């Protein structure tokens, strides 16, 4: 019994180390989302901080469309970060059984 508890504790500590490493890796990434066939792009960090917005000058005459494209590009980048985070966090918890419905911090 004690061996099982010790093994579980080691497994949990290893998972915690892996999760911390994955979070550090995620924080370092930059992802670019785009909309309007690439006419608008938004670059976000892994923490979803906006680093850059690029807008094709031809779009400045239609502010409403530009607003929609910026939002779509932001959402595209955000979804890419979510997918990357899920992948990295899944690798960090490989082999560790999480209870049904339990979600990671991301």
UniProtKB/Swiss-Prot annotation:
InterPro entries: YbaB-like_sf, YbaB/EbfC
Main location: cytoplasm
Keywords of the record: Cytoplasm, DNA-binding
Signal peptide: none
Keyword Cytoplasm included in the entry's annotation: yes
One GO molecular-function entry: DNA binding
Described function: Binds to DNA and alters its conformation. May be involved in regulation of gene expression, nucleoid organization and DNA protection.
Annotated protein name in UniProt: Nucleoid-associated protein Smlt1015
